[in-house]
A protein has these predicted regions:
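Membrane-proximal helix-turn-helix segments that form the acceptor-binding/catalytic region
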Residues: 112, 137-154
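Glycosyltransferase donor-sugar binding loop
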Residues: 44-51, 201, 227-241, 257-259
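Aromatic "clamp/platform" in nucleotide-sugar-dependent glycosyltransferases that forms part
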Residues: 279
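Short hydrophobic beta-strand element within catalytic cores of glycosyltransferases
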Residues: 296-300
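Conserved donor-binding/catalytic core segment of Leloir-type glycosyltransferases
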Residues: 156, 182, 190-220, 229
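Carbohydrate-associated surface elements
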Residues: 161, 181
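N-terminal strand-loop element at the rim of the active site
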Residues: 5, 13-21, 27-76, 233
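Conserved acidic donor-binding segment of nucleotide-sugar-dependent glycosyltransferases
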Residues: 313-322, 331-336
Length: 381
């Protein structure tokens, strides 16, 4: 395919090329498709996990190399990764996500080849994240992260807020900001007013603040027949705690387990709202997917999508039970006409700033500049 990246060989490096990677996996899969659509050649590198081979088709025929892990999975030491990167004869390498061994492998590749190397932390330098597992992150900084940050051509931020976090952590002020792309919008125009169903889709993890959400749900003023449907995956202990709190209610909230593909589409199709009360996010794909489907959202400011509030596509909730309860009450008070206006605003955002076309154009400029700057021996301005 001929395009602005015609012939450019781009490596995408990440901890997980499967559903276990959550939103980062979805972002990498979308990024790979975008590069292919612009004429580039993509090679994906990741640590092997139980879903690696099942989910490889998400990369639509691009080569996916997964390396077996030696030792603790949370570190992800894969002794064959550096050699695999070097053997791929890449023009540039792009790391998605940090704090695991792929960061060390990427830094080694950059040092040995001198070729352009990009890092997208995906919100993993948010203070809420860096405050957790402090000693492990301190070892990672000393062992390889700082080396990688200094050797990168540039660091990529999803939002201006993340750009500040990157600067605070790395002492580099040259990061560039490009948001994740959402899916193309699913239809436009007037939608049928959905039944009172609120949906969460994503990882079951403390940072998602789901315990507070369910407790707020139990205390909210809800319309007749209202349901909270939580779909996701995570640590068994986190899931068990969530199910315990759900069981304290009246049966209107339920945990569905993981939802992918057609199951996820069916969930979105019946949702009046998508909710995300997170303590910390990079730029959540779940929200972009909701907006592309014309579904307004209830979310925290920590989702880093202030455009949603200003455009009227989202209701802001706080992170404590009382604030979430108030936001749920406000959402349920919206009538069909007000809800439709918010649905229209969501579609507009998905069609404009977060559209695949807009995001692709921004990345085409970055990658094209990469090749030019490589010839000149310069970093991105």
């Amino acid at each position: 395919m001929i395009g602005p990246l015609n012939g450019l060989r781009v490596g995408l490096l990440t901890a997980s090329a499967s559903r276990l990677g959550g939103g980062v996996f979805e972002a990498v899969a979308a990024h790979a498709a975008m590069i292919r659509d612009m004429g580039g050649a993509v090679h994906v590198f990741a640590l092997e996990d139980c879903f690696s081979h099942d989910d490889a088709p998400r990369f639509a025929g691009s080569p996916v190399t997964v390396l077996p892990v030696k030792g603790p999975q949370q570190i992800g030491f894969a002794p064959g990764m550096v050699r695999a990167l070097l053997d791929a004869d890449l023009d540039c390498l792009h790391l998605h996500g940090i704090w695991m061994y792929p960061s060390a492998a990427g830094a080694a590749w950059a040092s040995r080849t001198g070729k352009p190397y990009f890092i997208s932390p995906h919100g993993m330098l948010d203070p809420w994240i860096t405050a957790r597992g402090r000693w492990k992150k301190a070892l990672a900084r000393l062992g390889y992260e700082r080396r990688g940050w200094s050797s990168a051509q540039a660091l990529h931020a999803l939002t201006l807020r993340e750009a500040r976090d990157i600067s605070d952590e790395t002492r580099r002020n040259d990061s560039f900001v490009i948001p994740n792309a959402g899916p193309d919008p699913i239809g436009t125009g007037t939608k049928a007013f959905p039944s009172p169903t609120m949906v969460y889709i994503g990882r079951i993890h403390p940072k998602k603040n789901l315990i507070a959400l369910v407790q707020a749900w139990h205390g909210a003023v809800r319309p007749e027949g209202a349901r909270l449907e939580i779909a996701g995956w995570g640590d068994p202990d986190d899931i068990a705690l969530l199910q315990t709190v759900i069981a304290q209610g009246d049966g209107s909230a339920r945990f569905l387990g993981p939802a992918f593909g057609a199951a996820k589409e069916a969930l979105l199709a019946r949702a009046r709202f998508v909710v995300l009360p997170s303590h910390s996010e990079g730029l959540p794909m779940a929200i972009l997917e909701a907006w592309a489907a014309g579904i307004p959202t209830v979310m925290t400011a920590e989702c880093n999508l202030p455009e949603g509030f200003s455009a009227g596509a989202a209701t802001e909730c706080g992170r404590d039970v009382a604030a979430i309860t108030a936001a749920l009450d406000a959402a349920w008070e919206l009538g069909a006409e007000e809800w439709q206006a918010r649905s229209d605003a969501a579609i507009r955002l998905a069609s404009d700033r977060f559209s695949p076309a807009a995001v692709s154009a921004a990345w085409a400029t970055v990658y094209a500049d990469t090749t030019e700057n490589q010839r000149r021996g310069a970093r991105l301005p």
